[in-house]
């Protein structure tokens, strides 16, 4: 989907009153406020999320990406590139190919050269960003941060949207109904995002076919999390049938997830990295 088109559809739906203004959420006369104003200007109330990517070159493809029904994630010497299937009439089309890299390791000019060498695109935009999480996801017990106001993590795994949905669902079911406190809710969403961060970091641990400074750095970003280790151990304890949730005829517990991922997701990724990718790299 195109974020801009989706936003326009919601805003024009007529299901609620829309007022365009630049206000401080604390001044909004409402019981509860969802603050989705995007990335903050001041990061003093935020903490860094460990990740090897901090920049991206967005490109307009010279081929029809919509022919492929799934997104591509392509390893490069400087990081990785996403290719999102997008219709040429979509507002997102000019930015649907992105060369993700680390600007502290690779100069922008070098990254752009490598991008154009590997992909048939016109460079549309250069962006740099921080990976971060809010220290306090809930302000004054009534202002709920969400979207890029809550956190930002590089696009590998496209984890952001699901996190936003999970957070709203949790708030509606537990906080607004008085089943949980705002303090505990803040701890839970921060833990959830930490798990998302770790799962994304795991993607880099086996490296790629490129022996470069970026991949050396990316592989060095290890983490320690007992919950992650337990999920990985569980995923290795079942075959491809038993790993399915009980509701689908398997043996694992329904709703047992680390961040957004079940034991099945762990098993698929673990086997892909340790068996398929490692074998292919040995042949290079």
Question: Where are the predicted features?
Answer:
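Tryptophan-centric aromatic hotspots in well-structured domains and transmembrane helices
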Residues: 6, 10, 32, 80, ...
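Short, solvent-exposed coil/turn linker segments
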Residues: 2, 21-25, 151, 185, ...
């Amino acid at each position: 989907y195109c974020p801009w088109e989706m936003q326009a559809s919601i805003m024009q739906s007529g299901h609620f009153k829309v007022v365009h203004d630049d206000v401080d959420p604390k001044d909004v006369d409402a019981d509860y406020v969802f603050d989705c104003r995007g990335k903050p200007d001041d990061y003093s109330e935020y903490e860094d999320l460990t990740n090897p990517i901090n920049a991206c070159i967005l490109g307009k493809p010279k081929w029809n990406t919509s022919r492929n029904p799934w997104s591509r994630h392509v390893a490069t010497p400087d990081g990785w590139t996403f290719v999102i299937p997008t219709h040429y009439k979509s507002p997102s089309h000019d930015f649907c190919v992105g060369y993700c890299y680390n600007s502290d390791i690779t100069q922008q000019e070098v990254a752009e050269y490598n991008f154009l060498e590997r992909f048939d695109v016109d460079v549309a935009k250069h962006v740099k960003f921080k990976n971060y999480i809010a220290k306090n996801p809930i302000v004054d017990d009534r202002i709920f941060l969400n979207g890029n106001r809550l956190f930002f993590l590089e696009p590998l795994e496209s984890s952001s949207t699901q996190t936003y949905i999970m957070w709203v669902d949790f708030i509606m079911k537990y906080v607004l109904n008085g089943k949980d406190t705002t303090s505990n809710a803040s701890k839970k969403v921060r833990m959830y995002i930490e798990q998302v961060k770790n799962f994304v970091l795991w993607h880099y641990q086996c490296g790629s076919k490129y022996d470069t400074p970026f991949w050396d750095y990316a592989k060095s970003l290890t983490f320690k999390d007992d919950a992650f280790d337990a999920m990985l151990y569980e995923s290795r304890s079942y075959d491809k049938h038993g790993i399915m949730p009980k509701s689908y005829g398997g043996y694992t517990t329904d709703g047992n997830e680390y961040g957004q991922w079940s034991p099945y997701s762990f098993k698929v990724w673990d086997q892909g990295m340790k068996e398929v990718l490692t074998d292919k790299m040995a042949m290079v």
